[in-house]
Amino acid sequence: MLYKKNSEEKLSNELFKNPTCEFRGTPFWAWNSWLEKDELERQIEIFNEMGFGGFHMHVRTGLKNKYLSDEYMQLIRDCVDKAKSEKMLAWLYDEDRWPSGAAGGYVTEDERYRARYLLFTPFKTAEAKKSVEVSAGRTNNGKLLACYDVVLDKDGYLSSYKQIGEDDKAEGTKWYAFMEIIGESDWFNGKTYADTLSKDAVDRFVEITHEKYKKCTGDEFDKTVPAIF
């Protein structure tokens, strides 16, 4: 169990009437501006006055301090120490915004760790009649994996298909299966999302993010810091 008191057989009346931090709300605390120690500690005091048991330090759009920098990590430590002094819980959050995996783009600076997807298209190159901008679209730099001869019946349903060579002529429509690397995005600070099917990519994410949090606050793991969200 995450909280040790959950293993107790009975809930005491005293604990029910005045629950400790484990049994109180812990809101997502949006970090979306320039962060300073004094202001962060002031807000933690307000959380405590409101009856919250802790908080999740959640990076959101607008953060001005450099994510995972020494300055940023010191602020994390300051908040953990403040939570401890207030008898509260400080939950960590492992990403710059969401979803977790790219570490704010630090993981995917290395293109080997960038997300990949399968593109199935009747166009060998991007010569479609209509251009549509999508996040997982055509790059013309994809790796051709296979070609297929796809035959549809008069109602547009699949009649047959078979794999053929790149230079073979198709009886129906020739379709191409490409492995593409996802394009860069401002959401990932000019990088991309990570290839979460790659163990090496996930290991790199853990190294950059979780290990850094462990170095900074590991002495409070399973104490003031119950988990990383």
Regions flagged by a language model, labelled:
Residues 1-16, 24, 41-50, 68-229:
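Mature extracytoplasmic enzyme cores
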Residues 27, 33-64:
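N-terminal cofactor/phosphate-binding cores enriched in small/glycine residues
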